[in-house]
Curated annotation (Swiss-Prot):
Subcellular location: Cytoplasm
GO molecular function, one term: peptidyl-tRNA hydrolase activity
EC numbers for this chain: 3.1.1.29
Keywords from the named record: Cytoplasm, Hydrolase
Gene Ontology CC terms: cytosol
Top enzyme class: hydrolase
InterPro entries: Pep_tRNA_hydro_II_dom_sf (IPR023476), Pept_tRNA_hydro_arch (IPR034759), PTH2 (IPR002833)
Protein name: Peptidyl-tRNA hydrolase
Purpose of the protein: The natural substrate for this enzyme may be peptidyl-tRNAs which drop off the ribosome during protein synthesis.
Catalysed reaction, written as an equation: an N-acyl-L-alpha-aminoacyl-tRNA + H2O = an N-acyl-L-amino acid + a tRNA + H(+)
């Protein structure tokens, strides 16, 4: 089974619309990286494009997760906001990882809680 995970910073106070847009940026960005890298995109598409949104504590943890994903060879995309609405330009908001095999992504994000 394959999935994509989006990790959102828990310390940012974002409106629902802003959060939805940032998650969409992370999902699409990670998908495009995966497609370029030869990751199993077609399998993920056939299986229904499973996506899971998780929460981390802060920017530092998000950056650590990004580095770990890169070290493990997982396609990933770090979102930096343009600063046109709610946030300062360059604010790191979330991270998209995958699509890739669930067990590979879980090695990076398996301890994180769901975003609720």
């Amino acid at each position: 089974m394959y999935k994509q995970v989006i990790v959102v910073r828990g310390d940012l106070k974002l409106s629902r619309g802003k959060l939805a847009a940032q998650v969409a940026h992370a999902s699409l960005g990670a998908f495009l990286r995966a497609k370029e890298s030869g990751a199993p995109v077609e399998e993920w598409l056939r299986e229904g494009q499973k996506k899971v949104v998780l929460k981390c504590k802060d920017k530092e943890e998000l950056l650590e997760l990004h580095e770990l994903a890169k070290r493990r060879g997982l396609p990933s995309f770090l979102v930096r906001d343009a600063g046109l609405t709610e946030l300062e330009p360059g604010t790191v908001t979330c991270l998209g990882i995958g699509p890739e095999r669930e067990e590979e992504i879980d090695r990076v994000t398996g301890d994180l809680p769901l975003l609720r």
